């Protein structure tokens, strides 16, 4: 009985996804044809015939973070009253899409937190980051959202995020190649205690 219900639910889910993908592809087709007409390109030539479908598929994958919640991404949370030292995930590489120009920005994110009682696996931190990088973003908000999600889900004594990224909307449109933008978000002890901040920054340098 349970297997039959799961099969029905899965079929319904696949139908909804297929319908959503079809709508997205039609919208991509209209957008792409308009773009080609404005720049003087022929959208019906051989190399471009399947481009709208590829655009729809690519953006569906790159922006799938909206379908996930931070709690789901973190997965299993462990209760541990012993571990109260800083935990750091250093230089996690990421890619995201700038909401202003729909061009990529990419780089690495370092995550630090001091547990109170709750711990999560390192893979959970990576998945949490993907929830927010796989959305239309600006770097400042991305950095803050990861910090706020950690505070909300793990209730740590503090959290700090440092994000360093290159923006293709800047590099491709202006003469500023390979420039890096750095943002940070500090919560709890990291905001209140300069020694805690200094310890985290030293770990990133080592």
Curated annotation (Swiss-Prot):
GO terms for molecular function: GTP binding; GTP cyclohydrolase I activity; zinc ion binding. InterPro entries: GTP-CH-I_C/QueF, GTP-CH-I_N, GTP_CycHdrlase_I, GTP_CycHdrlase_I_CS, GTP_CycHdrlase_I_dom. One of its GO terms (biological process) is one-carbon metabolic process. Pfam families: GTP_cyclohydroI. Keywords: GTP-binding, Hydrolase, Metal-binding, Nucleotide-binding, One-carbon metabolism, Zinc. It catalyses: GTP + H2O = 7,8-dihydroneopterin 3'-triphosphate + formate + H(+). Zn(2+) binds at residues 98, 101, 169. The keyword Cytoplasm does not apply. Pathway: Cofactor biosynthesis; 7,8-dihydroneopterin triphosphate biosynthesis; 7,8-dihydroneopterin triphosphate from GTP: step 1/1. Its EC number is 3.5.4.16. It comes from the Bacteria. One of its GO terms (cellular component) is cytoplasm. The keyword Transit peptide does not apply. Toroid-shaped homodecamer, composed of two pentamers of five dimers. Belongs to the GTP cyclohydrolase I family. This is GTP cyclohydrolase 1. The lineage of its organism: Bacteria, Pseudomonadati, Campylobacterota, Epsilonproteobacteria, Campylobacterales. The gene is folE.
């Amino acid at each position: 009985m349970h297997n039959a219900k799961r099969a029905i639910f899965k079929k319904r889910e696949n139908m909804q996804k297929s319908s959503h993908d079809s709508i997205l592809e039609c919208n991509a087709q209209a957008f792409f044809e308009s773009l080609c007409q404005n720049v003087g390109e022929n959208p019906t030539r051989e190399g471009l015939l399947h481009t709208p479908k590829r655009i729809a598929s690519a953006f569906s994958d790159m922006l799938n973070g909206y379908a996930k919640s931070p709690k789901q991404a973190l997965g299993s949370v462990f209760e541990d009253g012993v571990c109260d030292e800083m935990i750091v995930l250093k230089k996690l590489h990421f890619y995201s899409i700038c909401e202003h120009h729909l061009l990529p920005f990419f780089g690495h994110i370092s995550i630090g937190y001091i547990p109170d009682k709750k711990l999560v696996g390192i893979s959970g931190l990576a998945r949490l980051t993907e929830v927010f990088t796989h959305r239309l973003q600006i770097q400042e908000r991305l950095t803050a959202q990861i910090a706020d999600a950690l505070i909300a889900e793990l209730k740590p004594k503090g959290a700090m995020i440092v994000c360093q990224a290159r923006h293709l909307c800047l590099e491709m449109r202006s003469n500023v190649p390979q420039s890096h933008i750095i943002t940070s978000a500090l919560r709890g002890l990291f905001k209140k205690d300069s020694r805690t901040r200094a310890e985290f920054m030293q770990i990133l340098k080592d």
